[in-house]
């Protein structure tokens, strides 16, 4: 595996296995790919591949590329399921804590994903019900963003440039982080500006309330 061509072929197999139906296969391939990414080998290729899979979620139906005997899904499905959405997120969310510049791709996909996901909630809760791809993204990103520093420059930029339609995603990311640590003054300021520039919906401030001045909150400055 010293020759580049052989290593690239090996990497290609690994990347394909990162979306395999069998969890053990997927996890093993993902671990090796992350090691290769951390060492700097083919970092761009790995990240571009993860973004390609992430962008599948903009499509109204799952692409045929996700199916086949070699993927552990011999039958092509024409509707999104929660498991297939998770597979498309798997590698990308593993890379996100290592490179927060990938945030911009997550925001783009979240804002443009309109498809529904069919989720089996069990007979007691009504069986199979449709939810949005966006809701699945919000649920899956929790473990991925938890290790991101609260003072991440990319996080501050994300809040500052918050594209319309991505407010809930950004609120969720920051809420996960501020469950463990206080928001920085810079982050609080970014949310204040976001509140003023948008609909002045006070819910935008919820993730950073514990970083605001007590008097500011008591006076209800943002509740009028």
Locations of regions flagged by a protein language model:
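Eukaryotic alpha-helical solenoid repeat scaffolds
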Residues: 1-224
């Amino acid at each position: 595996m010293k020759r580049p061509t052989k290593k690239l072929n090996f990497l290609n197999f690994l990347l394909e296995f990162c979306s395999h139906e069998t969890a053990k296969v997927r996890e093993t391939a993902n671990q090796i790919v992350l090691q290769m990414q951390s060492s700097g080998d083919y970092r761009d290729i790995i990240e571009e591949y993860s973004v390609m899979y992430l962008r599948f979620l903009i499509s109204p139906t799952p692409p045929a590329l996700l199916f086949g005997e070699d993927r552990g899904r011999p039958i092509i499905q024409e509707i999104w399921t929660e498991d297939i959405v998770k597979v498309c997120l798997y590698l990308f969310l593993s890379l996100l804590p290592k490179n927060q510049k990938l945030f911009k791709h997550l925001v783009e996909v979240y804002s443009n994903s309109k498809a529904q996901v069919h989720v089996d909630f069990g007979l007691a809760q009504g069986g199979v019900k449709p939810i949005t791809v966006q809701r699945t993204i919000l649920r899956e990103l929790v473990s991925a963003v938890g290790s991101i520093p609260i003072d991440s420059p990319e996080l501050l930029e994300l809040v500052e440039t918050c594209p319309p339609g991505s407010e809930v995603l950004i609120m969720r990311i920051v809420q996960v982080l501020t469950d463990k640590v206080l928001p920085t003054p810079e982050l609080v300021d970014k949310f204040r500006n976001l509140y003023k520039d948008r609909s002045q919906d006070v819910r935008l401030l919820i993730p950073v309330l514990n970083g605001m001045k007590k008097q500011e909150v008591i006076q209800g400055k943002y509740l009028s």
